């Protein structure tokens, strides 16, 4: 019998076994990596250097997932979490890690993905940009709602690896001005007796509570997300909220009737005040709706934008196309440096908001086009000099990548919150020698989590 077969049949290599191991690294999901019986074991809530006692909870032939039972010897990278439910809540993965070590680990994530998946061995990599704040940085929070067995309205985030809610009254990574709203609004919902949606029974109304703040203006927007209209006395309660909180600019009701995990529905109704909150970003004014996309860490996004502008070295004569534009967060600042800008966005509300933002800032050289990148990009009458890509986590669709190769814009700026899909797409764009990477810049948009933002500039290779 071979050695590997001996390990496979070892009484310890099975679900429920309790073993000791040492964490030697982190994967891109933020889990600790250890080894037992020459096989990889992934353990959440751990740090490189930890010596642990763990229970194997999911066992495969070559790897296992484990639950932390006891820290036998803590890593020097450990720190006390700022959140009292950090060990339960699934919102943050790295509350227990020293912030400087988080930064180093995120830089390594980028390197590992580009080397392992992309095959890039020589990278023009800049030092990772740290977030201006490691706590209190989030300008938006959307909480699932539930009701306890005693009737208490709960709001929070799901437990790690489950769909069970962890009730919270404050969250250290969100803007502190939202915490008071969270606590008081939960009480008001409870006092009103509004029904809470039950996912198992597919009954009830209120599903989520969404809070957004313009961190530079202080304006806030409150949105209730419900399966149905008809919350009793909603207008009265909305008026009370506006009177109680001077910085609260509006209350909205979003309708999401589908029995799925989608958070926002297609219909949003303004109940009181304005349906937007205003924010300052890159010396511009932005209006943000209940469900329009905007980077949740304004300070870090501004840092990355500044470095991107420097690296692109725009001369003023370019046509720039922003292929996943949102409300124009990056489109509008960059438009001031080019001849013409085109913003492609699939969300119609974001298109309208982007057009409004251009008008507010008197930026006349931007056109917002509604539709998917797959359908709109091939119809453009002029090939862009600069193409900006900031796709969802899944990356660019294959047809988008093929269209980029067909058009061959001179420069591509690709921004991603998912290094593995970024590396995959870069590998495709550079595979035939059409493009070369000239600049790689990571930025910490999401402190206390394992997520990292990365921007890459590609330049067309002549011939």
Curated annotation (Swiss-Prot):
EC number: 2.1.1.-
Binding site for [4Fe-4S] cluster: 83, 89, 92, 171
Keywords, in A-Z order: 4Fe-4S, Iron, Iron-sulfur, Metal-binding, Methyltransferase, S-adenosyl-L-methionine, Transferase
Domain TRAM: 12-70
Record keyword Iron present: yes
PANTHER family on file: RNA M5U METHYLTRANSFERASE (PTHR11061), TRNA (URACIL(54)-C(5))-METHYLTRANSFERASE (PTHR11061:SF30)
Protein known as: Uncharacterized RNA methyltransferase sll1967
